[in-house]
From Swiss-Prot:
Cellular component aspect of the GO annotation: cytosol
Organism encoding this protein: Rubrobacter xylanophilus (strain DSM 9941 / JCM 11954 / NBRC 16129 / PRD-1)
Biological process according to GO: L-histidine biosynthetic process; methionine biosynthetic process; purine nucleotide biosynthetic process; tetrahydrofolate interconversion
Recorded name of the encoding gene: folD2
Catalytic function, reaction form: (6R)-5,10-methylene-5,6,7,8-tetrahydrofolate + NADP(+) = (6R)-5,10-methenyltetrahydrofolate + NADPH; (6R)-5,10-methenyltetrahydrofolate + H2O = (6R)-10-formyltetrahydrofolate + H(+)
Protein name: Bifunctional protein FolD 2
């Protein structure tokens, strides 16, 4: 029996209905969540993502604005835009699109965000809360990985809260936006978690780690990095990679492929995600889910007249 392909689109559709219902509920109380993106330069992937989330925000009934700056903009210009959005009561969530140009400090920009509006948990306070298992917001891509895994497990008759404590989750990639948060989410579910990256590959030890995986999350940004020799029979593999490659058929088109060698891994896996159409659709909706949660929290703060602490939106299993 071949591996099951986990299509993320219907899962994203179900999540989108939940988020839309939350937006309607807030609207009935006079609250309209608002998402703002900050785009510096003309990076193709960042522009494409901005268009997607902007369209989704409009579809769900959220306010949306994109602040665009030229690549030559100074760091002070970006910080000024962030400060303006922090102060705007119509904006509940802010996403600074990456990559930023090399002359602009990501830590400086991320640290300037209002933590209550930092829906990707890049502010040091929010990143720390996530690492402590008390997240204010869970970053959208790692959240999407585990949301997809949880739904797949449930539909195959395995409660996630029973699966993870008996399983090893291996995360390939240690980026601040995917790999490291994914490790924290694995720990929050009670799994044994192994984190590895390019250093393990260069040392010739990546395979010995990935062969231990019951669930494998690959976010290395290397096309076809993981083939069947890196996985054991029955693994559940989640591919976060989005790598543009030339069509091997010679059409001249550019194709998007993941970090898994899909056909090879499918010979041994129980299930795996495609690229595109796996994690990506859920990631987009999760960003708006965080925006709506931020809008709800800011409305509560305005009514109560004070600062609120971290609400623990996704502590343990509750938020996912």
């Amino acid at each position: 029996m071949g591996a099951r392909v986990i299509d993320g689109r219907p899962i994203a559709g179900e999540l989108k209905k939940r988020v839309a219902s939350e937006v309607e509920g807030l609207a009935a109380r006079g609250v309209r969540p608002g998402l703002a993106t900050v785009l510096v330069g003309e990076d193709y992937a960042a522009r494409a993502y901005e268009r997607r989330v902007g369209g989704l925000a409009a579809e769900l009934g959220c306010r949306y604005v994109c602040e665009r700056l030229p690549r030559e903009a100074e760091e002070a210009d970006v910080l000024a835009v962030v400060g303006k959005l922090n102060a705007d009561p119509r904006v509940s969530g802010i996403l600074v699109l990456r990559p930023l140009p090399g002359h602009i400090s990501e830590p400086a920009v991320f640290s300037a965000l209002d933590p209550l509006k930092d829906i990707e948990a890049v502010h040091p306070v929010n990143a720390g809360l996530l690492a402590l298992g008390r997240p204010r917001y869970v970053p959208s891509t790692p959240a999407a990985c585990f949301y997809l895994l949880d739904r797949y497990l449930e539909r195959s008759g395995r409660p996630p809260e029973e699966f993870y404590p008996r399983s090893t989750v291996v995360v390939v990639g240690r980026s601040n936006n995917v790999g490291k948060p994914a490790v924290s989410l694995g720990f929050a579910r009670g799994a044994a978690v192994i984190s590895c990256d390019a250093n393990a590959y260069r040392a010739g030890r990546l395979r010995e780690h990935t062969l231990k995986a019951d669930a494998l999350i690959v976010a290395a940004g290397v096309a076809g990095l993981i083939d069947e020799s890196y996985v054991r029979e029955g693994v559940i593999a989640v591919d976060v990679g989005i790598n543009p490659v030339a069509d091997p058929g010679g059409s001249g088109r550019t194709l998007l492929v993941g970090d898994l060698d899909f056909g090879s891994v499918a010979r041994k896996a129980e299930a795996l995600t495609p690229v595109p159409g796996g994690v990506g659709p859920i990631t987009d909706v999760w960003l708006l889910k965080n925006t709506v949660a931020a809008g709800r929290g800011l409305a509560f703060r305005a009514r109560s007249g004070g600062e609120r602490g971290a609400p623990g939106i996704s502590g343990g299993y509750g938020g996912q």
